[in-house]
């Protein structure tokens, strides 16, 4: 694949991914698997090389008699025999071979792709395109720089492979978990982020409370946000025998839940992700429209979105599957006589804010 084609494909992919705006995470990070903090975005250049390499093992198969194989052996057989020990027969005087240094461009690209593998082809477990692609892509780092930045601010170590793996998947939609992925990468566009990282001429003060708007300030601490989280965790605690107290690690990274009940944890993740989105939406209303959204309105929107998700799941899934997921413990809903009953009350209870000092402030992150 020519370089101009790779460039145009990458441009189309990342323009779509970032909605035509500035890329806030490196392309090499986005190409990592989900469990390593990426989005598993395809690398078109490496994918083209993997498709080429798929047929190279036939060149070293003495039993293959395809015409194109004899043609390939002529142009690059001698070079391949030096790279792969078990293909020494390609050096035989019985096989015509090209001894120059400038084979046709197509075969030159194949040789470059083989060099990028850094491994003898015969040592691979199989010759599928996926196997070649995994070997061609850059190895996953131990962890991304954002992981160290978060641990320094929180003064604790975190299980990042589990955190990255739990961000996407489960019962949440990709749209709902997008904000969690941005927070984990330290790229959510709070005012402090725009001021310190993007160097924009904007105030770093929150539009609602006037304090520096860090991630924790915007999503955990600002004005009535603790009341919203108090309501959300009162709902979440119905799934667990031991009450849970919210914290930044639990809200941002879903870390700290008991590991015994996977179905309860899956529903707790949904509630947290929807709550994060509605809190951020209320923040945007205050920032751009100069309107303060009351707590009651935010909670009402969370309930509305939960009802939408429950009804959609009921219409899409079989009844046993629905009961084992959304109907777990009959906290959010239940099915009686083939009728769906959504148990999330329309009534909103005002909670005291005296017990909402659970969100510890930590400074705005700056991640390279």
Show where each model-derived region lies.
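Basic, alpha-helical interaction scaffolds
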Residues: 1, 54-60, 241-256
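Short, solvent-exposed helix-loop connector elements
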Residues: 1-4, 28-32, 254-265, 286-291
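Extended C-terminal regions of large enzymes
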Residues: 9, 21-189, 310, 314-368
């Amino acid at each position: 694949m020519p370089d101009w084609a790779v460039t145009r494909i990458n441009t189309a992919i990342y323009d779509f991914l970032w909605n035509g705006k500035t890329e806030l995470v490196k392309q090499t990070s986005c190409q990592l698997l989900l469990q390593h903090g990426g989005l598993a975005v395809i690398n078109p250049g490496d994918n083209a090389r993997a498709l080429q390499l798929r047929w190279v093992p036939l060149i070293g198969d003495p039993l293959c008699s395809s015409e194109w194989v004899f043609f390939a052996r002529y142009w690059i057989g001698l070079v391949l025999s030096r790279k792969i020990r078990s293909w020494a027969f390609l050096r035989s005087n019985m096989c015509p071979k090209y001894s120059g240094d400038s084979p046709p461009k197509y075969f030159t690209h194949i040789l470059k792709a083989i060099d990028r593998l850094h491994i003898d082809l015969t040592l691979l477990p199989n010759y599928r395109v996926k196997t070649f692609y995994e070997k061609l892509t850059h190895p996953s780092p131990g962890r991304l720089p954002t992981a160290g930045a978060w641990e320094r601010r929180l003064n604790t170590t975190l299980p990042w492979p589990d955190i990255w793996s739990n961000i996407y998947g489960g019962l949440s939609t990709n749209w709902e978990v997008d904000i969690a992925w941005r927070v984990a990468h330290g790229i959510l566009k709070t005012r402090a982020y725009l001021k310190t990282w993007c160097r924009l001429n904007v105030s770093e003060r929150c539009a609602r409370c006037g304090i520096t708007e860090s991630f924790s300030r915007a999503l955990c601490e600002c004005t009535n946000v603790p009341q919203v989280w108090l309501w959300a965790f009162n709902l979440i605690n119905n799934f667990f025998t031991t009450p849970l107290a919210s914290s930044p690690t639990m809200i941002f990274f879903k870390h700290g839940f008991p590991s015994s009940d996977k179905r309860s944890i899956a529903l707790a993740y949904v509630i947290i992700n929807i709550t994060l989105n509605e809190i951020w939406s209320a923040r945007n209303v205050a920032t751009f429209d100069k309107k303060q959204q009351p707590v009651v309105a935010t909670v009402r929107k969370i309930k509305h979105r939960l009802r939408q998700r429950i009804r959609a799941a009921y219409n899409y899934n079989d009844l046993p599957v629905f009961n084992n997921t959304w109907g777990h413990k009959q906290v959010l809903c239940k099915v009686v006589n083939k009728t769906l009953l959504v148990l999330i009350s329309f009534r909103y209870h005002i909670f005291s804010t005296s017990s909402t000092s659970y969100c510890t402030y930590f400074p705005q992150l700056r991640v390279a």
